[in-house]
Amino acid sequence: TSLLGCGGDKIIVGSETNTNPISNQRPVLNVYIENSGSMDGYMCDGSQLKDAVFDYVSDLSVCSDTTSLNYINNRIIPYKGSLEQYIKTMTPTTFQKAGGNHSNSDLGEMLKMILQEMTDTSVSIFISDCILDLPVSNSQKFLSRCQISIKNAINEGRNKIPDLGVEIIKMTSDFNGKYYYPNGGIEKLKYVKRPYYIWIFGNNNILAKLNSVVPVNELKDFGFEGIVAYSKK
C-alpha cells in the first residue's frame, strides 16, 4: 500500500524487511506521553501501558546517548525525574498538575511540536490514545482538517529530516475511567481493554539499528497488537 506525499513522493506502508543501512549513531531519545483527560483511564493500577512504556524506553535508553522525558498536550512539559519515577507517578492527578490543557488536545499540533524538536540524530517516542477532538456538528469536515494537519506535520518533518521514518505500534491496555464520545457524551468505563498507540520518529538508519537491538515483538507481553512503518522510498 502507498500514500502520496507532497510532490508525488510515495510513503510506503507495509511489512517488508527493513533494508535501510544500520547506523552506529547513538541517538538522543525524546519521550512524550499525552497528558490530556482522555488518557487518565490508562493510569489505573496494573496498567499495561505503564509497563510497556517502562520496558520499551528502558531498552531503547541503553542504545541512546541521552533520554529526555516529557508530557505533551497543547505544549511540551519536560519531566526532570528518572524514568522509574516518571512511570511510578503517572496518575490522573499528576497528569493534571503537570500543566497544559488537560481538557482536550490536537493530535496534529502535538505531532508538529514533536517533529519541530527533532534533529537527524534524535528519535522521538509519542504515546497517545490518538482520539481526535472533533466537534459534535460538522465532524466530517473537521476530521478532514485533522487528517490534513497530521499529513502537513509529517511532511514538514520530512523536509527537515529527509530520511525520516515513522513507526506506529498499536497496543491495548486496561482502562478504568471516563470515555469521551464524539457526540459529547461521557461514559465511565471500568477495567475494559482500550487501544493506544506508540509513535516512533527518527532517521531510517537509526530506527533500523534500534529495531535490531530492541525488536517491537518484545512488547507482546504488554498488549502488542501490530505495527505499521512509513518511510520515503
Give short role names for the model-derived ranges.
Residues 11-13, 37-44, 77-81, 132-142, ...:
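Extracytoplasmic/secreted cell-surface and envelope-processing proteins
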Residues 114-188:
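A charged, solvent-exposed segment within the mature domains of Sec-exported extracytoplasmic proteins
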Residues 162-233:
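Eukaryote-biased recognition of electropositive, low-complexity segments
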Residues 45-56, 93-112, 137-157:
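Well-ordered, non-membrane alpha-helical segments in soluble/globular domains
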Residues 1-4:
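Sec-dependent bacterial lipoprotein signal peptides
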